[in-house]
Swiss-Prot record:
It comes from Pongo abelii. The gene is TMEM174. It is a multi-pass membrane protein. The chain crosses the membrane at residues 40-60, 73-93. It is found in: Endoplasmic reticulum membrane; Apical cell membrane. GO terms for biological process: phosphate ion homeostasis. Interacts with SLC34A1; regulates SLC34A1 internalization by PTH and FGF23. Regulator of plasma phosphate homeostasis. Decreases serum inorganic phosphate (Pi) uptake by regulating the sodium-phosphate cotransporter SLC34A1 trafficking by PTH and FGF23 in the kidney. This is Transmembrane protein 174. The keyword Transmembrane helix applies. InterPro entries: TMEM174. It comes from the Eukaryota.
Length: 243
Protein backbone atom coordinates (compact mmCIF):
# COMPACT_ATOMS: atom_id res chain seq x y z
CA UNK A 1 0.00 0.00 0.00
CA UNK A 2 2.86 2.37 0.81
CA UNK A 3 4.49 1.64 -2.56
CA UNK A 4 1.21 2.37 -4.36
CA UNK A 5 0.78 5.67 -2.52
CA UNK A 6 4.40 6.56 -3.29
CA UNK A 7 3.79 5.99 -6.99
CA UNK A 8 0.71 8.20 -6.89
CA UNK A 9 2.72 10.96 -5.25
CA UNK A 10 5.42 10.66 -7.94
CA UNK A 11 2.82 11.36 -10.68
CA UNK A 12 0.50 14.13 -9.43
CA UNK A 13 -2.55 14.99 -11.50
CA UNK A 14 -3.16 18.71 -11.94
CA UNK A 15 -6.61 19.99 -12.91
CA UNK A 16 -7.15 23.52 -14.18
CA UNK A 17 -10.02 25.21 -15.94
CA UNK A 18 -9.80 26.86 -19.34
CA UNK A 19 -12.25 29.53 -20.46
CA UNK A 20 -14.04 28.53 -23.65
CA UNK A 21 -12.84 30.15 -26.85
CA UNK A 22 -15.43 31.20 -29.40
CA UNK A 23 -13.93 30.97 -32.89
CA UNK A 24 -14.54 33.96 -35.11
CA UNK A 25 -15.51 33.80 -38.77
CA UNK A 26 -11.92 34.58 -39.79
CA UNK A 27 -10.63 31.53 -37.90
CA UNK A 28 -13.05 29.13 -39.56
CA UNK A 29 -11.34 27.15 -42.29
CA UNK A 30 -12.60 27.77 -45.83
CA UNK A 31 -14.53 24.74 -47.05
CA UNK A 32 -14.32 23.09 -50.46
CA UNK A 33 -17.75 24.43 -51.44
CA UNK A 34 -16.58 27.99 -50.86
CA UNK A 35 -13.50 27.40 -52.99
CA UNK A 36 -15.55 25.90 -55.81
CA UNK A 37 -18.09 28.73 -55.65
CA UNK A 38 -15.39 31.39 -55.78
CA UNK A 39 -13.72 29.65 -58.72
CA UNK A 40 -16.97 29.49 -60.66
CA UNK A 41 -17.80 33.11 -59.87
CA UNK A 42 -14.50 34.54 -61.08
CA UNK A 43 -14.43 32.22 -64.08
CA UNK A 44 -17.93 33.33 -65.07
CA UNK A 45 -17.00 37.00 -64.73
CA UNK A 46 -13.88 36.52 -66.85
CA UNK A 47 -15.69 34.55 -69.55
CA UNK A 48 -18.50 37.11 -69.57
CA UNK A 49 -16.08 39.99 -70.12
CA UNK A 50 -14.30 38.12 -72.92
CA UNK A 51 -17.64 37.27 -74.53
CA UNK A 52 -18.76 40.88 -74.41
CA UNK A 53 -15.46 41.99 -75.97
CA UNK A 54 -15.70 39.50 -78.82
CA UNK A 55 -19.33 40.42 -79.43
CA UNK A 56 -18.48 44.11 -79.68
CA UNK A 57 -15.52 43.36 -81.98
CA UNK A 58 -17.63 41.22 -84.32
CA UNK A 59 -20.80 43.25 -84.57
CA UNK A 60 -19.80 46.90 -84.26
CA UNK A 61 -16.26 47.73 -85.28
CA UNK A 62 -15.46 45.03 -87.82
CA UNK A 63 -18.63 44.68 -89.86
CA UNK A 64 -16.90 44.86 -93.25
CA UNK A 65 -13.92 42.64 -92.44
CA UNK A 66 -14.37 38.89 -93.05
CA UNK A 67 -11.48 37.90 -90.79
CA UNK A 68 -13.49 38.78 -87.65
CA UNK A 69 -16.63 36.78 -88.49
CA UNK A 70 -15.73 34.08 -85.92
CA UNK A 71 -16.04 36.67 -83.17
CA UNK A 72 -19.72 37.07 -83.97
CA UNK A 73 -20.31 33.44 -82.86
CA UNK A 74 -17.62 33.06 -80.19
CA UNK A 75 -18.58 36.19 -78.27
CA UNK A 76 -22.16 35.17 -77.43
CA UNK A 77 -21.07 31.61 -76.59
CA UNK A 78 -18.48 32.83 -74.07
CA UNK A 79 -20.96 35.33 -72.68
CA UNK A 80 -23.60 32.64 -72.13
CA UNK A 81 -21.07 30.30 -70.47
CA UNK A 82 -19.88 33.08 -68.16
CA UNK A 83 -23.42 34.00 -67.15
CA UNK A 84 -24.15 30.31 -66.45
CA UNK A 85 -21.10 30.04 -64.17
CA UNK A 86 -22.11 33.19 -62.30
CA UNK A 87 -25.66 31.88 -61.77
CA UNK A 88 -24.36 28.52 -60.46
CA UNK A 89 -21.99 30.27 -58.04
CA UNK A 90 -24.72 32.58 -56.76
CA UNK A 91 -27.62 30.09 -56.56
CA UNK A 92 -25.90 26.87 -55.50
CA UNK A 93 -22.91 28.06 -53.48
CA UNK A 94 -24.51 31.33 -52.26
CA UNK A 95 -21.48 33.47 -53.04
CA UNK A 96 -23.45 36.74 -53.34
CA UNK A 97 -26.08 36.19 -50.67
CA UNK A 98 -27.59 39.04 -48.71
CA UNK A 99 -25.99 40.41 -45.54
CA UNK A 100 -28.93 39.42 -43.30
CA UNK A 101 -28.71 35.80 -44.47
CA UNK A 102 -24.98 35.71 -43.70
CA UNK A 103 -25.48 37.12 -40.21
CA UNK A 104 -28.19 34.57 -39.38
CA UNK A 105 -26.02 31.69 -40.61
CA UNK A 106 -23.04 32.92 -38.57
CA UNK A 107 -25.19 33.08 -35.42
CA UNK A 108 -26.35 29.51 -35.96
CA UNK A 109 -22.78 28.29 -36.47
CA UNK A 110 -21.53 30.13 -33.37
CA UNK A 111 -24.30 28.65 -31.21
CA UNK A 112 -23.47 25.14 -32.44
CA UNK A 113 -19.72 25.47 -31.93
CA UNK A 114 -19.80 27.17 -28.53
CA UNK A 115 -19.31 24.58 -25.72
CA UNK A 116 -21.88 24.38 -22.95
CA UNK A 117 -19.41 25.02 -20.13
CA UNK A 118 -15.76 25.54 -19.30
CA UNK A 119 -13.04 23.16 -20.41
CA UNK A 120 -10.95 21.15 -17.96
CA UNK A 121 -7.44 19.95 -18.73
CA UNK A 122 -5.79 17.07 -16.82
CA UNK A 123 -1.99 17.20 -16.82
CA UNK A 124 0.65 15.16 -15.05
CA UNK A 125 -0.22 11.98 -16.97
CA UNK A 126 1.09 10.42 -20.16
CA UNK A 127 -1.25 12.43 -22.42
CA UNK A 128 -3.23 15.49 -21.27
CA UNK A 129 -7.00 15.07 -21.42
CA UNK A 130 -9.37 17.96 -22.13
CA UNK A 131 -13.09 17.85 -21.29
CA UNK A 132 -15.36 20.48 -22.88
CA UNK A 133 -18.42 21.43 -20.87
CA UNK A 134 -18.08 18.55 -18.43
CA UNK A 135 -18.59 18.47 -14.68
CA UNK A 136 -15.35 17.35 -13.03
CA UNK A 137 -15.19 16.09 -9.45
CA UNK A 138 -11.71 15.80 -8.00
CA UNK A 139 -11.19 12.66 -5.92
CA UNK A 140 -8.80 12.91 -2.98
CA UNK A 141 -7.80 9.45 -1.70
CA UNK A 142 -7.72 8.90 2.08
CA UNK A 143 -4.32 8.90 3.76
CA UNK A 144 -2.82 5.47 4.08
CA UNK A 145 -2.03 4.38 7.63
CA UNK A 146 0.39 1.78 8.89
CA UNK A 147 0.15 -1.52 7.03
CA UNK A 148 -2.10 -3.89 8.91
CA UNK A 149 -2.09 -7.64 8.53
CA UNK A 150 -4.70 -9.01 6.23
CA UNK A 151 -7.71 -10.34 8.13
CA UNK A 152 -8.08 -14.12 8.24
CA UNK A 153 -11.40 -15.87 8.47
CA UNK A 154 -11.38 -17.69 11.83
CA UNK A 155 -14.22 -20.00 10.90
CA UNK A 156 -12.29 -21.02 7.83
CA UNK A 157 -9.20 -21.71 9.96
CA UNK A 158 -11.25 -23.79 12.38
CA UNK A 159 -12.58 -25.84 9.54
CA UNK A 160 -9.07 -26.33 8.17
CA UNK A 161 -7.60 -27.59 11.49
CA UNK A 162 -7.68 -31.37 11.77
CA UNK A 163 -9.67 -33.12 14.55
CA UNK A 164 -6.48 -33.91 16.39
CA UNK A 165 -5.44 -30.20 16.47
CA UNK A 166 -2.41 -31.03 14.36
CA UNK A 167 -1.89 -30.90 10.61
CA UNK A 168 1.12 -31.24 8.37
CA UNK A 169 2.55 -28.41 6.31
CA UNK A 170 1.58 -30.04 3.01
CA UNK A 171 -1.99 -30.58 4.19
CA UNK A 172 -2.27 -26.99 5.42
CA UNK A 173 -1.09 -25.62 2.08
CA UNK A 174 -3.58 -27.77 0.20
CA UNK A 175 -6.40 -26.78 2.55
CA UNK A 176 -5.58 -23.06 2.35
CA UNK A 177 -5.57 -23.11 -1.45
CA UNK A 178 -8.99 -24.80 -1.62
CA UNK A 179 -12.17 -22.67 -1.56
CA UNK A 180 -14.02 -22.23 1.73
CA UNK A 181 -17.58 -22.40 0.47
CA UNK A 182 -18.50 -25.77 1.94
CA UNK A 183 -16.96 -25.23 5.38
CA UNK A 184 -18.43 -21.76 5.82
CA UNK A 185 -21.92 -23.08 5.05
CA UNK A 186 -21.69 -26.14 7.33
CA UNK A 187 -19.84 -25.34 10.59
CA UNK A 188 -18.19 -27.79 12.95
CA UNK A 189 -21.37 -28.18 15.01
CA UNK A 190 -22.65 -30.57 12.39
CA UNK A 191 -22.70 -34.19 13.46
CA UNK A 192 -20.51 -35.12 10.53
CA UNK A 193 -17.71 -32.97 11.91
CA UNK A 194 -17.85 -34.14 15.52
CA UNK A 195 -14.51 -35.68 16.41
CA UNK A 196 -13.89 -38.72 18.51
CA UNK A 197 -12.74 -38.08 22.04
CA UNK A 198 -10.21 -40.86 21.86
CA UNK A 199 -8.05 -39.00 19.40
CA UNK A 200 -4.46 -38.90 20.69
CA UNK A 201 -2.96 -35.50 21.46
CA UNK A 202 0.58 -34.76 20.46
CA UNK A 203 2.17 -32.17 22.73
CA UNK A 204 5.82 -31.46 22.98
CA UNK A 205 7.08 -32.80 26.26
CA UNK A 206 10.75 -32.34 27.10
CA UNK A 207 13.53 -32.65 24.55
CA UNK A 208 12.66 -36.21 23.52
CA UNK A 209 13.06 -36.85 19.76
CA UNK A 210 11.14 -39.82 18.37
CA UNK A 211 12.34 -42.09 15.61
CA UNK A 212 12.04 -40.62 12.05
CA UNK A 213 10.25 -43.76 10.83
CA UNK A 214 7.73 -43.44 13.65
CA UNK A 215 7.19 -39.77 12.74
CA UNK A 216 6.43 -40.69 9.13
CA UNK A 217 3.96 -43.37 10.23
CA UNK A 218 2.26 -40.94 12.60
CA UNK A 219 2.02 -38.27 9.87
CA UNK A 220 0.54 -40.80 7.46
CA UNK A 221 -2.03 -41.87 10.06
CA UNK A 222 -2.89 -38.23 10.80
CA UNK A 223 -3.42 -37.50 7.09
CA UNK A 224 -5.67 -40.54 6.70
CA UNK A 225 -7.69 -39.56 9.79
CA UNK A 226 -7.99 -35.97 8.55
CA UNK A 227 -9.25 -37.15 5.15
CA UNK A 228 -11.74 -39.45 6.88
CA UNK A 229 -12.95 -36.66 9.16
CA UNK A 230 -13.31 -34.18 6.29
CA UNK A 231 -15.45 -36.44 4.14
CA UNK A 232 -18.70 -34.58 3.34
CA UNK A 233 -21.96 -35.83 4.85
CA UNK A 234 -24.44 -37.59 2.60
CA UNK A 235 -27.06 -35.59 0.76
CA UNK A 236 -29.98 -37.19 2.62
CA UNK A 237 -28.48 -36.14 5.95
CA UNK A 238 -28.22 -32.45 4.99
CA UNK A 239 -31.40 -32.04 2.99
CA UNK A 240 -34.15 -34.31 4.22
CA UNK A 241 -36.60 -35.08 1.44
CA UNK A 242 -40.23 -34.12 2.24
CA UNK A 243 -42.57 -37.08 2.45
Amino acid sequence: MEQGSGRLEDFPVNVFSVTPYTPSTADIQVSDDDKAGATLLFSGIFLGLVGITFTVMGWIKYQGVSHFEWTQLLGPVLLSVGVTFILIAVCKFKMLSCQLCKESEERVLDSEQTPGGPSFVFTGINQPITFHGATVVQYIPPPYGSPEPVGINTSYLQSVVSPCSLITSGGAAAAMSSPSQYYTIYPQDNSAFVVDEGCPSFADGGNHRPNPDADQLEETQLEEEACACFSPPPYEEIYSLPR
